[in-house]
Amino acid sequence: AEDFAIGGKQLHKKGDVICKMTTDSTGHADTGNAQMYVGAKYTLAETKAAEGYAINSDSKTFEFKFTGNSVSYSKLNIDVGNDSQKGKISVYKSGDAFTGVTAMGSAISVDENGEIMESGQTTYKPVFTECALSGAVFQVTATEDIVTADGTVHAKAGDVVAEIMTDENGYGETEPLYLGRYEVREIKAPFGYVMNSEPKYAELIYAGQEFEVRDTVDIEFENEYQRVMIRLSKTMENDELFGIGSNGEYKNVRFGLFAAEDITAANGTSIPAGGLISEISLEEDMSAQFDTALPFGKYYVQEIATDEHYVLNGEKYLVTFEYMGQDIQTVDIDCGEFENIIKRGRIEGHKTDDKSEPL
């Protein structure tokens, strides 16, 4: 109440609480037998909201007006609305990205004559670092009927209520949603990545009447960069007469994986065209595979060492590693078969006399 007096008699002092009301099941409440006077000013303020709702902080000031001598009391209807509390769901998306290149130099030594010897080639290693990912799209689905305290059904179980796309910082957020349980599932992976098909769950619960929108519920997802498996097989000529081909000669064979073009990382470093990335040896079954993590680009496979009895195969097998879509975890590339042939020589004889004259 505000200060109010009649004929010098103080009937209300400012701040007096005239009455407290609680709404019934129909949402109505009245002042009952509280004494209130025509001409006096009163303020109606909500002190406790219904469960699931944010308190209405807007108070309403009113005054009873004289309505004639035939009316014993005045009646005033005041509507006070409440908003159902809501919440937001945010996602953060991360994954390994091609951020740099590390160059590992050749081994350097000094021989017995003081000459500097260099062993092998410089190897370029792609560096992948976990980073925020943009462009991932998520679908938010109600896992139960979403019903507010007044009985209104805002979504049925299974209804899609929102879609989220991550920004350049890897974050995405829904609009305010009604309280309840939800499933968050990735439906589109960022370019270059494998979709994470595992759903995650979020529950927006009542956080008290002071909040119209409760704190955001955060969920994190991670994507794997699409990988590549580069396979090859080997055949080596066999010569039983000279015992070549059955004495583990394959153990001396090595293949290299090289960049066929400049491949540049996010930080500006690059693998130069012709740069060696990885070396492998043959398995006992004469097969080999490169499974190192690679950025998308063009490469070639080449034999770089073989047994001393064989001719080095100089053939280059070109490999293009392209993104094959979000449903493929590893791209399988078969380079086919590389063949080694035995080194052959020719012996020629010339017959001469004791004066070296041909006969």
Predicted segment positions?
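Solvent-exposed loop/turn and edge beta-strand elements of beta-rich ligand-binding domains
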Residues: A1-L359
